[in-house]
Amino acid sequence: MEVSHPAVHPVAVPPVLTEPPARVRMKDYQGMPGTLGGLALRLGQLGFAVLSFSIMVSTPDFSQVTAFCYLVAATVLQTLWSSITAVVDIYALSVRRSLHHSLLVGLFAVGDGVTSTLTFAAACATAGITVLIDNDLDECGQNHCGRFEAAAAMAFLSWIMAAPSFLLAFWSFGNKIVCF
C-alpha cells in the first residue's frame, strides 16, 4: 500500500503596512458633502457671497431699495451657511469620514435648497431693479449702477456654485429614502 506524503508548502509572511490602506468610497461623487469637490463649491459660494455683500454695502444708498437690502440679507445667510458647511467638510476630510448619515444629508439638502433659492431670488431682484434704473429711468449717472450690477453678478455666481451642492445633496438624500 502506497501512501502519499503531504508536501509542506511554506506560506510567506504578509508584509507589514506602514500606512493604512486607501479607503474606497464608491458612492462619493465630487461635489457631495465631505468631498474635495464639495469643499471647493462651498468655498466658491462663500467667496462670491462675501464679494456681493461687500460690493453692495460699499454703496452709500443701497438701503433705500428693498431688493438691495434683500440681497444683503441673502448673502449674509449664504455666507453663514457656506462657512458652517465648509467647516463640516474640512472636518470630514481631515478625519476621513463620509457624510452619509441620512439626517445629515437631509439637513445639507434643505439648507442648500433654501440658501440657493434665496440667493437666486435676491440676485434676480437686484438685477431687475438695476435694469429699471439704467434702461427705463436713465438715472445711472446719479446712482451706482456698476456696483449694483457687480453685486448681482457675484450673487449669481454664488448661486451657480450652490446649485450643484443642492442637487447632489438632494439626489443623495433621495437615494437614502426607502419607499415601501
From Swiss-Prot:
Keyword Transmembrane helix: yes
Parts of the chain that traverse the membrane: 37-57, 68-88, 103-123, 151-171
Residues on Cytoplasmic side: 1-36, 89-102, 172-180
Keywords from the UniProt entry: Cell membrane, Membrane, Transmembrane, Transmembrane helix
Cellular location(s): Cell membrane
Entry GO CC: plasma membrane
Record carries keyword Repeat: no
Superkingdom of origin: Eukaryota
Extracellular side: 58-67, 124-150
Membrane topology qualifier: Multi-pass membrane protein
Assembly and binders: Homodimer and heterodimers.
Family: Belongs to the Casparian strip membrane proteins (CASP) family.
PANTHER family found in the cross-reference section: CASP-LIKE PROTEIN 5A1, CASP-LIKE PROTEIN 5B3
Record-given protein name: CASP-like protein 5A1
Organism: Pteridium aquilinum subsp. aquilinum (Bracken fern)
